[in-house]
Amino acid sequence: MVEELVKKKIIPIVIGGSQDLTYAMYRAYDNLDQMVNLVAVDNQFDFAKENAFPSNSYLSKIIIEEPTNLFNYANLGYQTYYNSQEEIDLIEKMYFEAYRLGEVATNIAVAEPVFRDADLVSIDVTAVQSSFSGNFMQFNPNGFNGKEICSLTRYAGISDKVTSFGVFNFNVTSQEAVLIAQMVWYFIEGFSFRSNEYPFGSKEKYIKYIVPIDDEELVFYKSHISGRWWIEIPFLTNVNNKLKRVTLLPCTNEDYLAACEQEIPERWWKAQRRNIL
């Protein structure tokens, strides 16, 4: 069903059930001839653990089982004490992205370019503080507040690239229902403000900036319409590229300014490494 909706450019919003439904949503892209970027708002990475529930172990299946269409996994809001050091190291080893709760809560805008590059967004409601979600059956003293989680869903909605969206792992209570309804409302509001920029727009609508760093040339693009930024991931010769053409990676003005100071943006470096793994 998700596959058919995505083919028809209809965005499915999946509400309810456990978060391992993310795996089924991911598999819906198998026949769409594309690599998939998954963004999860979650307090843990959901790798398979001994005696773990399926809802807390779906990511291992996505990474291991074929066909392997996953290009990037990005986690927003993980809390260190819920994740082993081995899991954190594995995220780094695979050049995935992970942003701690405090990092995102302090500067919510750090999530915008992450969502702008997402195809599939999966939100675990247990990433929200219980005092805001109303979930006291599985008490979470820390997490995003109501304003922050709605800001994140709005970023997901406004992303031109997001084609499926899910909200999972909540208890069917009237308290949580109010928050989830508002999260979905903000996603839909964000969708109404989509600007149809990259990958749909023409490069003529962008200003191109070339920044030399050592033996590299970083190519940035800034949109005339929204003022948003992208950085080019080049197609490398003589290696196997997962991305079969030159691609633009969403970034920020701060990434451009850092490049001008000879600092290579971390998201660009990780994307380069993933592309040739």
Describe each region flagged by the PLM.
Residues 1-167, 171-277:
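Conserved alpha-helical scaffold segments that buttress catalytic/binding sites
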